[in-house]
């Protein structure tokens, strides 16, 4: 467990791809639920198929009770598969505005614009979830999320300002300069990054388009938001991911952030804060 000013015990379990179970203070969140078995394929458009080559650590039935879902976008199967859609039923879900419309009539789904904040009362605690911008594919919306609650505590930085401790889930995005502004409002105790340098051929053809961060971009964003620790996700076992753990470790070492990285073993709960 890494030292931190974070005041609540936080355990993270990596289920696979961008799916993580966050257990904090008796409340359980899940990110981008993907639960399909190994070698499942999803046609995207003529000539383009996404295939996973790993077995998620959990099935829908073996998940712990989930209090809320942080869904970066609903229109890509590697972030929300059919089992993940079933999980949304009857639960609190934070996602994009467009995604909330497409997931209707689920009453628990809330769509947020970038930098918009929604209150979330769970277990007697008032959480606040702030959406962050993403740049993923040219069409479609995607959000990251910052989660705070008074029980997380605060951190006073070198400028003398006390800011709320927070958990940041990046969603699917490449590096965006705009994201650095979260440092003005929050102290990011833990950042979970969807990385892997995912790349796809655009609908009109041409060179592969980078749609998630590579290691160097992730290291840059990590430094700019002033986060304490980084959990890498979304870099294994899909054909459109182009940078695996070896490449990421090399990039993080070169960028001087490797000592702040927490690698998770699939399916193994880890107390990170």
Regions found by a protein language model. Give the residues of each.
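Bacterial Sec-exported substrate-binding components of ABC uptake systems
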Residues: 1-18
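Pre-active-site segment of Zn-dependent metallo-hydrolases
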Residues: 2-3, 27-71, 80-86, 137-139, ...
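Structural motif
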Residues: 27-29, 67-68, 92, 127, ...
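Divalent metal-coordination and catalytic microenvironments
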Residues: 22, 32, 73, 81, ...
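Metallo-beta-lactamase
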Residues: 2-7, 92-164, 251-273
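Cap/insert and terminal regions of metallo-dependent hydrolase folds
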Residues: 94, 98, 174-266
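Active-site environment of divalent metal-dependent phosphoester hydrolases
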Residues: 18, 37-38, 74-80, 100-103, ...
């Amino acid at each position: 467990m890494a030292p931190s000013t974070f005041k609540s015990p936080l355990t993270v379990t990596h289920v696979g791809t961008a799916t993580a179970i966050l257990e904090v203070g008796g409340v359980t969140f899940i990110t981008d639920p993907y639960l399909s078995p190994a070698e499942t394929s999803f046609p995207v458009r003529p000539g383009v198929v996404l295939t996973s080559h790993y077995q998620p650590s959990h099935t829908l039935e073996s998940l712990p009770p989930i209090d809320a879902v942080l869904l970066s976008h609903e229109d890509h199967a590697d972030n929300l598969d059919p089992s993940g859609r079933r999980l949304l039923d009857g639960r609190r879900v934070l996602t994009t505005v467009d995604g909330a419309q497409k997931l209707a009539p689920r009453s628990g789904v809330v769509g947020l614009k970038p930098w918009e904040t929604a209150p979330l009362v769970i277990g007697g605690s008032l959480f606040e979830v702030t959406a962050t911008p993403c740049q993923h594919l040219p069409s479609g919306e995607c959000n990251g999320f910052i989660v705070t609650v008074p029980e997380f505590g605060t951190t006073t930085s070198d400028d003398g300002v006390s800011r709320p401790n927070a958990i940041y889930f990046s969603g699917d995005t490449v590096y965006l300069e705009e994201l650095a502004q979260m440092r003005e409002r929050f102290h990011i105790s833990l950042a979970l990054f969807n990385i892997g340098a995912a790349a796809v051929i655009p609908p009109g053809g041409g060179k592969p388009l980078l749609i998630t961060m590579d290691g160097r971009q992730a290291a840059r964003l990590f430094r700019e938001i002033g986060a304490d620790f980084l959990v890498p996700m979304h870099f294994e076992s899909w054909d459109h991911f182009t940078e695996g753990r070896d490449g990421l470790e090399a990039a993080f070492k070169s960028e001087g952030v490797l000592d702040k990285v927490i690698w998770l073993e699939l399916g193994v709960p880890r107390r990170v804060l």
